[in-house]
């Protein structure tokens, strides 16, 4: 049997990925650490070949070289994390695996995307400390400028921060200090995006391109506390003005056309204002993370594994048939709370009664979890379902921590 190696998958999608791959006649190999999963979720790994979790090309290459028998089984390699497409592309080329198109790897760079569609992104510059001095010509002189600083390749708001640059200080010095204090490995060795801060609603266009046809599944609208996304509504088309939705669709179509992107999903993030929208992250080649797969499945009356099979196999050219989606206007409203705690804590367990909504533990038991507002790594768990049901049931979830039992925090 042909095997598909999956490098990078979240704790929601992993519940369905084995069924998704096997029902198409393939066998999954998961590059994942099962110890990070809670309770019943570990049953997913029974009878499945797992290898260590890799995010580095050299490390994964070394592992595969040392396991020739495993390499002989692998037909294809893919990922559900857009920042890992460069790793997947390099490994596929080195070992001769089938893989998503190479443009997926190039599109993981925010700098590359901004260069393709500059009219659709906020004013921005790509900087690297290794390159020496830099200037930001688009800053407004003589006033305070608010900017967002983030790695050029990355997701989940890791190492993302908002900076207020006073009128009387050197912008480059402020940005250099923030990069050095970011807390990530080798901040001097990577590229960073400095982007004008935009105020508005955080929305994402979910959809895919198949054989040159762009399909928009609908808008997600997310609530944030600081840099943590805490709730997601899907579909949320009715919450955004038609003219702004058209601007969003134009931006996606322009990016697809100019990059020659095809046969893959997208999760394009925008800041939407009452009159326009700015693309802030393209996320090309993958479905939205967190609970998006469950929300699309619920909205469109499809099994999550069916949606995930479409996501995984479309870029690999392994689909037997086209999956048809009903009009978004016929979809039922879904809601997911990506809940947190309001203080740093160690999570011990969850207490969740029988309910209609779908609950997914996210935090690693025994690990210190940061409070809401820091990044998406503050997530404790997710509760997903039809909107009116989730609102009613979220209060039934209880999280046991080193500081006692706590209720979910999501606002």
Regions found by a protein language model. Give the residues of each.
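A short, structured beta-strand-centered segment in the mid-to-C-terminal lobe
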Residues: 237-245
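ATP-binding N-terminal substructure of ATP-dependent carboxylate-amine bond-forming enzymes
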Residues: 1-103, 386-389, 393-410
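Peripheral (often C-terminal) accessory segments that flank ATP-dependent C-N-forming ligase machineries
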Residues: 137-138, 309-411
């Amino acid at each position: 049997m042909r095997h598909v190696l999956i490098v990078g998958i979240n704790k929601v999608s992993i519940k369905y990925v084995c069924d998704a791959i096997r029902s198409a006649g393939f066998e999954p190999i998961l590059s994942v650490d099962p110890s990070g999963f809670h309770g019943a979720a570990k049953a997913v790994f029974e009878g499945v070949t797992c290898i260590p979790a890799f995010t580095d090309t050299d490390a994964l290459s070394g592992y595969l070289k040392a396991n020739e028998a495993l390499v002989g089984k692998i037909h294809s390699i893919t990922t559900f994390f857009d920042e890992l497409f460069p790793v997947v592309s390099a490994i596929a080329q080195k070992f001769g695996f089938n893989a998503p198109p190479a443009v997926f790897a190039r599109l993981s760079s925010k700098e590359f995307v901004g260069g393709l569609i500059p009219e659709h992104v906020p004013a921005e510059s790509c900087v690297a400390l290794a390159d020496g001095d830099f200037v930001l010509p688009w800053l407004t002189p003589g006033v305070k400028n608010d900017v967002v600083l983030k790695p050029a390749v990355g997701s989940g708001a890791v190492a993302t921060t908002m900076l207020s640059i006073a009128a009387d200080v050197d912008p480059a010095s402020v940005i250099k200090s923030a990069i050095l204090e970011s807390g990530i490995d080798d901040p001097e060795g990577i590229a960073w995006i400095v982007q004008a801060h935009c105020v508005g609603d955080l929305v994402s266009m979910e959809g895919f391109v198949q054989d040159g046809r762009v399909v928009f599944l609908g808008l997600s609208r997310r609530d944030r506390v600081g840099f943590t996304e805490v709730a997601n509504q899907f579909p949320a088309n009715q919450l955004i003005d038609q003219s702004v939705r058209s601007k969003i669709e134009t931006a996606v179509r322009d990016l697809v056309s100019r990059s020659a992107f095809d046969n893959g999903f997208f999760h394009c993030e925008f800041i939407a204002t009452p009159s326009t929208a700015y693309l802030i992250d393209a996320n090309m080649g993958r479905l939205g993370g967190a609970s998006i797969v469950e929300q699309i499945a619920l909205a469109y009356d499809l099994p999550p594994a069916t949606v995930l099979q479409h996501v995984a196999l479309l870029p690999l050219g392994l689909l037997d048939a086209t999956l048809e989606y009903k009009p978004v206007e016929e979809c039922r409203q879904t809601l997911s709370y990506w809940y947190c705690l309001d203080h740093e804590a160690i999570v011990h367990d969850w207490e969740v009664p029988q309910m209609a909504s779908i609950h997914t533990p996210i935090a690693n038991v025994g690990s210190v979890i940061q409070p809401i507002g820091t990044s998406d790594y503050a997530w404790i768990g997710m509760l997903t379902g039809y909107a009116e049901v989730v609102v009613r049931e979220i209060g039934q979830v209880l999280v046991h921590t080193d500081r006692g039992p706590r209720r979910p925090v999501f606002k």
